[in-house]
């Protein structure tokens, strides 16, 4: 099967060079990888789920983890602190994400989980929301024309979505920084 796969890759990308020149220096693919200032052993896989003990490593049970890499399991609040600390110190983060949800809009380059629970809304907002039809609510939540109130994701909500296969890791992206929306709410800047 490896020969077949390599033939497909060669057809679409061209044959892998034995040697090449970059910035005036000759490399093999292996020597070029070794010349980069990136040591993969300096990077860790961190996640947050309750079906494994916190502060231990485990193999995350998702289809994209085909190399059976282990992840450090930490509480969700600590995972968010790790993300923020990395960004504050000029590190980007690889992120396995679920882009199959209706809160992800590829062409408008936004991903949100809007608050749709009327009990979490204040008086006049809840009254107005209660008068909208289901179709009007969906249009308002997913028009992506202005910031909407976002759901506060808890450890339990994250675990339930994982257990029910609602939250998957169907797409890899890179978190590169933070910004704020028109209302001053923080969000992550992500390269798709």
Where are the language model's segments positioned?
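A short, structured loop/turn motif at beta-sheet edges
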Residues: 180-184
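Predominantly the structural core of cysteine protease catalytic domains
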Residues: 1-178, 188, 192
